[in-house]
């Protein structure tokens, strides 16, 4: 059993690293309006994972605080990334406008950790990540299908999602067994759903339950 640390790709305005990262151009840029890209326990701006300097800067922080202490696996949440307002024309990555190249973000986010871990001498690198794109498999991405509902409808959709991942050449894929939102443990229907989902999970590349 090993500890896996969850890391999100955004930084709060109140962080000790925020001003430095902003001045160095390591954050996703907002073309208009207030520079708040996600509201979650405060005002947040996303790291620009498409910027090689960002990947290096963040990994150095991760190495110092986690990898050097023995952490070998990371849970890369919010990898889409999850903007509070999906007005893609308002955001720009170092690699280009989000409207044009936005889908590469999760791949570059996985790359940020993979390349750092590899440089650190780690082998057999696998990190759990909430989103992926073509080429993510190159960077040790173990993708899960995100925060889904505890319903038979969402359960059925996982079959399609898993097939799509396989067709994209991404071998490591899983789901939140039983779903993420809305399950009531005392409900017999949910109990049946959980059993069926565990049966499905047995045949997935990775068997995993979340909360």
Language-model features: locations:
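Catalytic-domain carbohydrate-binding cleft regions of carbohydrate-active enzymes
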Residues: 1-211
